[in-house]
Curated annotation (Swiss-Prot):
Family: Belongs to the arenaviridae GPC protein family.
Annotated transmembrane regions: 18-33, 420-440
Protein name: Pre-glycoprotein polyprotein GP complex
UniProt lineage: Viruses, Riboviria, Orthornavirae, Negarnaviricota, Polyploviricotina
Residues covalently joined to lipid (N-myristoyl glycine): 2
Molecular function terms, GO-annotated: metal ion binding
GO cellular component, one term: virion membrane
Annotated residues for binding of Zn(2+) 1: 57, 454, 462, 464
């Protein structure tokens, strides 16, 4: 009833469009011709029954939806931050930046070549050991803070200085248990696992030394932006206690220069994913602006904020990197840090903000809001683990598309007009078939012309009594 009322209200509007006029003409012709066919068929009551019976339509979904994924990299955004990667279970590398040719190796082993009796004891200043190399100084500071080393309470760090005859410096952390309640070894081991990922650990032959030395970067392992995020999160505790809740962090969108744009914009492909995959533009950003409870939205805001921050920095010095670090630490919410820490401690699948999956409609190109591809035991889950979730997401995507299409159609063409056109076409097709088939409408005397008024009964006589009972054979005739 509501559709009928809205239809009459929109009569002056829909005739302005050619499509609506064509639909109206087709509807009118189909109805008139259908009524004529119905009249000629001789079975009006049956036709009305066929029209009124079984007016239902089913719509199946899933034919044009596919399960797809993409991988993010932030090398172009965090190009000034160290990049971590693991070569094997005992050898790790920290690249000074994403564009640097220098690196810091972190070895976890059972032997150490640096002795405190012959070397220097590090108390927070690395200049004497690194040869006043500012790049290595701040990288060492980041790594040691990421390992949660406390210079005031933890065992001392020994180093072998960089000399003219020896271009290599070495730092050594002794993880030997000093007393029964000493948890320094477990703390460093947990921090290494958090920074570089899980590694094989033999309880019978434990590693008791961590050695760090300068080296060169020659693509020994594959970098991932997850490592940079882990290092940022590990260093976040240093500024966490001194910062308060700020009101400037909101979910409003802006352009590349920082100008507020509530409607959102399309992020560049190079910043998110490779050009051959998919650029998530206004659609995904608009969804994040309305509902920002997913990891994908967190990463988009993190990318966007740091892109603006990096473009406003004047140089690539240590002060600029520290400023960026504090900005990122302020950006990452306490809930985000706590959630990932708890998931790691509970050993349940967690999000590493690297790979995301989404449901894509192959015909229209519309897609759902990407969700994180979970990781468990250092490896991505199988596609089958997301089956129920992505089927449900597919249903939501179809429902959203149908709702959007309904609103657009109702705005341009009244839905009732489309329904009338459809059912009138069904009506015309049905009556045309009945007209072609035809139904017997009266009796004839076999082998003779039809007598008027030719309404004969089964005895061959007219029902009105004009003719006598002829008792001749009768046949049914169709009247066309």
């Amino acid at each position: 009833m509501g559709q009928l009322v809205s239809f009459f209200q929109e009569i002056p509007v829909f005739f302005q469009e050619a499509l609506n006029i064509a639909l109206a003409v087709v509807t009118l012709l189909a109805i008139v011709k259908g009524v004529l066919n119905l009249w000629k068929s001789g079975l009006f009551q049956l036709l009305m029954f066929l029209i009124l019976a079984g007016r239902s339509c089913s719509f199946r979904i899933g034919y044009h939806t596919s399960f797809e994924s993409f991988t993010m990299t932030i090398g172009g955004v965090f190009h000034e931050l160290p990049a971590l990667c693991k070569v094997n279970d005992t050898y790790n590398l920290v690249r000074l930046s994403h564009n640097s040719s220098l690196a810091l190796s972190v070895e976890y082993g059972d032997t150490g070549t640096v002795m405190c009796e012959h070397g220097h004891v590090v108390s927070g200043n690395y200049t004497e050991c690194t040869g006043a190399s500012e790049e290595y100084n701040w990288v060492l500071d980041w790594v040691l803070r990421g390992l949660q080393h406390d210079f005031s309470r933890d065992p001392v760090i020994c180093c072998e200085p960089k000399k003219k005859t020896n271009a290599e410096f070495q730092f050594r952390l002794n993880l030997t248990q000093r007393h029964k309640g000493d948890h320094y070894q477990n703390k460093i081991k947990t921090a290494l696992t958090h920074l570089f990922g899980p590694f094989a650990y033999n309880e019978k032959d434990p590693k008791i030394f961590v050695t760090m030395r300068n080296t060169t970067w020659t693509n020994q392992c594959v970098m991932s932006h997850t490592d940079s995020l882990r290092l940022l999160a590990s260093n976040g505790g240093n500024s966490f206690s001194g910062r308060g809740l700020k009101a400037f962090f909101s979910w409003s969108l802006s352009d590349s220069t920082g100008v507020d744009m509530p409607g959102g914009y399309c992020l560049e492909k190079w910043m998110l994913i490779a050009s051959e995959l998919k650029c998530f533009g206004n659609t995904a950003l608009a969804k994040c602006n309305l509902k920002h409870d997913s990891e994908f939205c967190d990463m988009i805001k993190l990318f966007d904020f740091n892109k603006n921050a990096i473009s406003k920095l004047n140089n690539n010095t240590i002060e600029a990197v520290n400023q960026l670090t504090k900005t990122v630490n302020s950006l990452i919410s306490d809930n985000l840090l706590m959630k990932n820490r708890l998931r790691e401690l509970l050993k349940v699948p967690y999000c590493n903000y690297t790979r995301f999956w989404y449901v894509n409609h192959t015909r229209t190109g519309e897609h759902s809001l990407p969700k994180c591809w979970l990781v468990n035991n250092g490896s991505y889950l199988n596609e089958s683990d997301f089956r129920n979730e992505w089927i449900l997401e597919s249903d939501h995507l179809i429902s959203e598309m149908l709702s959007k299409e309904y609103q657009e159609r109702q705005g341009r063409t009244p839905l009732t007009l489309v329904d009338l056109c459809f059912w009138s076409a069904v009506f015309y097709t049905t009556t045309l078939f009945l007209h072609l088939v035809g139904f017997p409408t009266h009796r004839h005397i076999s082998g003779e012309p039809c007598p008027l008024p030719h309404r004969l009964n089964r005895h061959g006589a007219c029902n009105c009594g004009r003719f006598k009972r002829l008792k001749k054979p009768l046949v049914w005739y169709k009247h066309h």
